[in-house]
Amino acid sequence: MPIKTIFVPLSDAEGAAKTLNAAIGLAEGFGAAVNVVHLRADPTQALGDFVGESVSPQLVEEVLTQAEKRATAIAAAARKAYDAAAKTAKGVKLSYSESTINSDVAVETQGRLSDIVVVRRASGTRDVGARVVAEAALMGTGRPVLVLPTTPPAKIGTSVVIAWNDSLEASKAVNAALPFLTRATRVSVISANAESAIDQKGIIAYLGTHGVKARGVSVKAGADAGKAIVSAATRAKANLLVMGAYSHSRVREMIFGGVTEHALSSARLPILLVH
C-alpha cells in the first residue's frame, strides 16, 4: 500500500522539530500529506499523585492552575515547532490540530485513518508521554509505526535492514515496509540465529517479486538477539531497521519482548515496527 497519509502525534514539544522535519522529508519523497495532532494534557491528571490523600481545596486549585499553565506552554511550543517546520515543506499538504481527549483514543482514532504513524523514541524511563504515544500507535492503530531516534538521519530508508525470523510479525513488517524497500538502494535481511539457522531464501525471493534486491546476513544471537540485530544494522550503516513488534499485552499496558525493547531503547536509527 502506498504511503499517502502520515500521522504525527505530539505529546509534548521535546524533539518536535526533528520529528516534524523527518515526517515532512518522508512526505516529500512519497507525495504524502502530514497530519499533526498535539495531544494536550488534561490538567486533572496532575491530581493523580494525591489520590487517597486528604488535600485542601486551595492545594487542588493550585495544582490545577500550574498544570494548565504547563499544558498551555507545551501547546504553544508544539505549535511553534510545527509553524517552523511547515515553512520548510516543499509541496507537502500539512494540517495541525489539538486534541484534548484521552491521548490513547486520539492516537488510535487518527492513526487508523493514516498509512503510517511517526513518533519519537522515549528519551528514558521517565519520558512517559512518548512511551504512551508509541504504545497506543503500535497496539491500537493496526498501522506501521516509525520510531525516530533523538537525532534522525538526513535520509530515511535508503539503506534498510530487515530483522527476519520467519514470524507473523516480521512478515507484516516487511509487507508494510515495501514502500521504503522498493526505493532503497541497499536492503539486507538479517537473522539472529540462536540455535539453528533461519532460512532466508523465501523472504529474499518474495522481495525479488517486488523488484527489491536483498542480501542475506546471519549473525550469532548469543544471549541477546536484540543487541545482535542492532549491532548488525549499525555495521551495515542502515538508516532504517524493519522489524516486527513483539509484546505481551495486559489490558492497556504493553510489555515489549526483549528484542523489541532493546531496539527501542538503544538503536540510533529509525525503526519501522508492526505489531
Where do the model's predicted regions map?
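Short, small-residue-enriched loops and turns at beta-alpha junctions
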Residues: 125-126, 194-198, 221-223, 249-250
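A short acidic, glycine-rich active-site loop
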Residues: 58-76
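Small/aliphatic-rich secondary-structure junction motif
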Residues: 1-62, 140-143, 150, 156-220, ...
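Short low-complexity, flexible loop/linker segments enriched in glycine and/or proline
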Residues: 50-52, 161-162, 230-233, 257-258
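Gly/Ser-rich helix-loop-strand patches that form or flank binding pockets
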Residues: 20-22, 105-153, 234-275
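Alpha-helical scaffolding segments of alpha/beta enzyme cores, especially the outer helices
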Residues: 25, 81-84, 109, 136, ...
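Structural beta-alpha unit
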Residues: 1-2, 15, 41-44, 69, ...
